[in-house]
Amino acid sequence: MSDTTLELAKRIIACASVTPEDAGCMDILIERLKPLGFSIEFINRNGVTNLWARRGTTAPLFVFAGHTDVVPTGPLDKWTSPPFAPEIRDGVLYGRGTADMKSSVAASVTAVEAFVAANPQHPGSLAFLLTSDEEGDANDGTIAVVEALKARGETLDFCIIGEPTSVDTLGDMVKNGRRGSLSGVLTVKGIQCHIAYPEKGRNPIHEAAPALAELAATEWDQGNEYYQPTTWQISNIHGGTGATNVVPGSVDIKFNFRFSTASTPEGLQQRLSAILEKHKLDYEIKWTLGARPFLTGRGPLADAATTAIREICGIETELSTTGGTSDGRFIAEICRQMLEIGPVNATSHKIDECIAVDALPKLSAIYRRILEQLMTA
């Protein structure tokens, strides 16, 4: 390897790749992958840079997936050092993307370099799926690559996404799935009138309140071995004209389900509508299914990750499905086994985002050890 994981991470962190820009990150990575025999394919869409790089043509196919884009920096004067000028202070590397998730991308590349050097004739194939559209709308990123791979009948046997999954120390948590996300905009209709004469109208906020209370108190399911119970939360309520003397004619309530495999989107929609009907509301709902839940149970990939973390970090990892959605929701459609394994998440998206320097070689070693268990004869 010409660079350590730290040096490669610093090079791509220095690229100001605010979503949906790649800002040269993938060019740096391609420089490292081509000498290893990776074929390079861009599956770009609507200005988004998407890379599919593959070494080998046979099964099993092991993929490292991730993103090179980062969230905006926020106020530059709040940063202790410039966000795109990576700096080490007291054993910690600072810069936008250090945790989410350029360090993981660098670690996956150096892990593959080391693995291929030691196992040049390894069975199966290795690949990288990288996008510059994960932190934004994600309409033209990983999903575009998945659609292209699906169209030509490709299936991923194993996939690791380098999202920052650890909580307190590297390796203490691995995501083996994610909950689904189902959002809705509920419009409850009333009759606008002068607030001094409420009998001449119908206040939709008052009418909706009992139903909302019941929805908030409903147990949607009890979860299961891998998932916490489904939750329902209101995110926004808007009603009225802004005047203090007008009963509003309607109220809009935005809400979200984070749901487990113990429920289905269709079942949740039906149950919610039944509660609204019980309260005799005049309403409309617009639904958006953001993601279905996905899960990798115990098996070769989870066992390999558990072993690797035990050997490298000296701890037992926890398999978890908590947290928000990720690009795994797209990859799951064509992947048999998938995990998210990455650094501590505490500073992701924050001012002075950072990662412990000693976590970088360890993360690379974890990735390499997983490859050694699954991709050697």
Curated annotation (Swiss-Prot):
CDD domains per UniProt: M20_DapE_proteobac
Any GO BP annotation: L-arginine biosynthetic process
Chain residues that bind Zn(2+) 2: 100, 135, 349
Cofactors named for this entry: Zn(2+); Co(2+)
This protein's UniProt keywords: Amino-acid biosynthesis, Cobalt, Diaminopimelate biosynthesis, Hydrolase, Lysine biosynthesis, Metal-binding, Zinc
Subunit and interaction comment: Homodimer.
Gene Ontology molecular functions: acetylornithine deacetylase activity; cobalt ion binding; succinyl-diaminopimelate desuccinylase activity; zinc ion binding
Name used for this protein in its record: Succinyl-diaminopimelate desuccinylase
Main function: Catalyzes the hydrolysis of N-succinyl-L,L-diaminopimelic acid (SDAP), forming succinate and LL-2,6-diaminopimelate (DAP), an intermediate involved in the bacterial biosynthesis of lysine and meso-diaminopimelic acid, an essential component of bacterial cell walls.
PROSITE patterns in the record: ARGE_DAPE_CPG2_2
This enzyme's EC code(s): 3.5.1.18
PANTHER family listed in its UniProt record: ACETYLORNITHINE DEACETYLASE, N-ACETYL-L-CITRULLINE DEACETYLASE
Catalysis: reaction(s): N-succinyl-(2S,6S)-2,6-diaminopimelate + H2O = (2S,6S)-2,6-diaminopimelate + succinate
Family: Belongs to the peptidase M20A family. DapE subfamily.
Residues annotated to bind Zn(2+) 1: 67, 100, 163
Enzyme class: hydrolase
Pathway(s) served: Amino-acid biosynthesis; L-lysine biosynthesis via DAP pathway; LL-2,6-diaminopimelate from (S)-tetrahydrodipicolinate (succinylase route): step 3/3
Disulfide bonds: none
Pfam families: M20_dimer, Peptidase_M20
Active site: 69, 134
SUPFAM superfamilies: Bacterial exopeptidase dimerisation domain, Zn-dependent exopeptidases
Cofactor binding, per record: Binds 2 Zn(2+) or Co(2+) ions per subunit.
